[in-house]
Each structure stands twice: as C-alpha cells, then as structure tokens.
C-alpha cells in the first residue's frame, strides 16, 4: 500500500493515472509472467490472410511492365478469397455426401465444374491437373 502514497505526490496529470494502473496490475500479472521482460511487445499483431503477393507475382509473369493499385489489389484479393471459399464449401459438401472425411483432388475438380461456367471450368481443371502433376513429380 506504500506506492499509493508515493503516487499521490506525483503531478496532477500523473496522479489520476497511477491508481488505474495499480488496479489493473493484478489482472495483468498473470498474463505478463510468461512474457519476456526485456521490453518486447506484449501482443503481436494479428496476421491477416492475403493473396496480394501471389497476385503480384502472376501479374509480373503475364505483364512485367504493368502495376496495380491498392484498390484493384483489394478487389482481386476479395475475389480470390470468395472463389476459394465457394470451392472449399462445395468440395466439403461433396465429401460429406460420399461419407468421406478427406477432400481429395477429385472433390475439388467436381466442385470447380459445378461452380465455374463452361470454358472457364475446362481451363481451370486443366491448369489444376497440370499443377497437381507437377507437384506429384517433384516429391
């Protein structure tokens, strides 16, 4: 209790802050005991999933001299996330219909056929098959 009397002698701007910190100290003690005491951050920033770097790499392969704005990148990132979620959801449904607990390339291929229209699904399936073959041969 001695620190409270010392805190009351601090300037007025600091005096009101000291009791609040003292009242929060016991609650934080349990959390900070495992954290390093060398002044490191208490919490790391939450990581945000993004396809931006991959979109940029593909753009540079296709059009090396073309750039992309942040707004366009955000739109493409949202588009890729949406398509990924649709395909994953459909593949999950197909796996559950067939009483399987694992999503294989067959479920992904079927879900792409169901979600993407016409010629687009044919190109997506051929590119996907090519990617799976390349991955399998590298193992």
UniProtKB/Swiss-Prot annotation:
InterPro entries (alphabetical): Histone-fold, Histone_H2A/H2B/H3, Histone_H2B, HISTONE_H2B_site
Keyword Nucleotide-binding: no
Sample GO molecular function, one term: DNA binding
Family: Belongs to the histone H2B family.
Post-translational modification: Monoubiquitinated by the UBC2-BRE1 complex to form H2BK123ub1. H2BK123ub1 gives a specific tag for epigenetic transcriptional activation and is also prerequisite for H3K4me and H3K79me formation. H2BK123ub1 also modulates the formation of double-strand breaks during meiosis and is a prerequisite for DNA-damage checkpoint activation.
Subunit structure: The nucleosome is a histone octamer containing two molecules each of H2A, H2B, H3 and H4 assembled in one H3-H4 heterotetramer and two H2A-H2B heterodimers. The octamer wraps approximately 147 bp of DNA.
Record flagged with keyword Transmembrane: no
UniProt biased composition (Low complexity): 1-37
Listed PROSITE patterns: HISTONE_H2B
Keywords on record: Acetylation, Chromosome, DNA-binding, Isopeptide bond, Nucleosome core, Nucleus, Phosphoprotein, Ubl conjugation
Lineage per the UniProt record: Eukaryota, Fungi, Dikarya, Basidiomycota, Agaricomycotina
Predominant place of localization: nucleus
Record's function text: Core component of nucleosome. Nucleosomes wrap and compact DNA into chromatin, limiting DNA accessibility to the cellular machineries which require DNA as a template. Histones thereby play a central role in transcription regulation, DNA repair, DNA replication and chromosomal stability. DNA accessibility is regulated via a complex set of post-translational modifications of histones, also called histone code, and nucleosome remodeling.
Cross-link (Glycyl lysine isopeptide (Lys-Gly) (interchain with G-Cter in ubiquitin)): 134
N6-acetyllysine found at: 9, 17
Positions bearing the Glycyl lysine isopeptide (Lys-Gly) (interchain with G-Cter in SUMO) cross-link: 9
Stretches for region Disordered: 1-48
Name of the featured protein: Histone H2B
Domain of life: Eukaryota
Cellular component GO terms, alphabetical: nucleosome; nucleus; site of double-strand break
